[in-house]
A protein has these predicted regions:
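Beta-sheet-rich non-transmembrane sensory/scaffold domains
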Residues: 1-246
Length: 246
């Protein structure tokens, strides 16, 4: 950005990290959702101090942490909206009680080897889904859009100041990339998942997105927290949208 060459990352702890992408030098961070897994983050070096009770937990000993194993931010990509200098990310606001348990080592097996109890993140008023926009210069939150249903796609921004995203409640939305205002939405056949894409044919722009069942960690959490949100267990499809001809 400008003369600086930067790289940003955001993972399950919900912390947006900023580094020099040439030297790796730490430049700053922002907590995008409530987290209590780290007791301290050094503002100069970025070094984190992890909670000792989590590090030293014994088998069948319960600990509580935010965010849950769904994130923070899961695998869904965030988008950089260059005209406004905003990094816009899909976020998940849930927490977790967790206890390690002994499991048999079986070839081809796998799993979390833990007992889990999900709960709503404090201070969110029950909103599991959040879109957060962050100024890449100051690392401050400029706007957020929060809702009960969790988001299950990456965010995609356009040169026309739009950002597209989809959620578990089957809604595909276009927001104002500068303010977060919802400008348009439609409801698809089942939960919206994957990555919205934009493409053009003969000068006409199209927006495409997939609906699907399965997929991401945040999908399973509302099954025990937001049981009122339901969606068909079928309906995998590709949807393509465009503006009508004038």
């Amino acid at each position: 950005r400008g003369e600086e060459k930067l790289v940003f990352s955001l993972g399950k702890y919900g912390i947006l990290w900023k580094h020099d992408r040439v030297s790796g030098e730490f430049k700053g961070y922002k907590e995008t959702v409530f987290q209590n897994a780290f007791t301290d983050i050094d503002s100069v070096t970025g070094r984190v101090t992890y909670r000792e009770d989590i590090q030293n937990a014994k088998l069948n000993e319960w600990t509580s942490a935010c965010p849950s194993s769904a994130g923070g931010k899961d695998w869904h990509s965030m988008t950089y909206h260059e005209p406004s200098g905003l990094m816009i990310a899909p976020l998940s606001q849930t927490c977790l009680e967790n206890a390690a348990r002994e499991v048999a080592l079986v070839q081809g097996g796998g799993g979390l080897a833990a007992s889990r109890k999900f709960f709503e993140m404090p201070g969110t008023d029950g909103n599991l889904g959040k879109i957060g926009a962050y100024d890449v210069d100051t690392m401050e939150e400029v706007w957020s859009h929060q809702q009960r249903a969790s988001f299950h796609t990456g965010t995609m921004s356009t040169g026309g100041d739009l950002v597209f995203v989809g959620d578990l409640d089957r809604r595909f939305k276009a927001l104002n990339a500068r303010t977060g205002e919802v400008l348009w939405e439609t409801r698809l056949g089942t939960s919206v998942q994957g990555h919205p894409v934009s493409f053009a044919i003969d000068g006409k722009q199209y927006i495409a997105v997939t609906s699907a069942v399965g997929g991401t960690s945040p999908r399973t959490v509302p099954d025990v927290i937001a049981t009122e949100i339901t969606y068909p267990r079928w309906g995998n499809a590709l949807y393509v949208f465009s503006l009508p001809e004038e």
